[in-house]
């Protein structure tokens, strides 16, 4: 599975309300750019802005997972 498909799958299973908005704000793009990126089938087809917002979105999801793991260790 390539990185683009992985992000699409994670969006369907892991994201919380506000994650897309937060990623768009951090990347400095509109939600339309995010939606456009999800419609692409190959990672090579992504523009720089689309790539940036998807990577930012992935970072948000990864940070949440890391935070949950840290809390589990503390408890």
What is each stretch, according to the model?
Residues 1-17:
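Short, amphipathic alpha-helical "recognition" segments used to contact nucleic acids or chromatin
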Residues 30-45:
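Recognition helix of helix-turn-helix/homeodomain-like DNA-binding domains
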Residues 45-67:
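Short Lys/Arg-enriched helix C-cap and helix-to-coil transition segments
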């Amino acid at each position: 599975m390539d990185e683009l498909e992985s992000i699409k799958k994670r969006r369907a299973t892991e994201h919380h309300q506000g994650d897309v908005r937060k990623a768009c704000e951090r990347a400095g793009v509109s939600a339309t750019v995010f939606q456009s990126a999800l419609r692409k089938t190959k990672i090579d087809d992504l523009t720089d802005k689309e790539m940036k917002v998807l990577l930012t979105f992935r970072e948000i999801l990864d940070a949440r997972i890391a935070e949950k793991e840290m809390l589990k260790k503390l408890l």
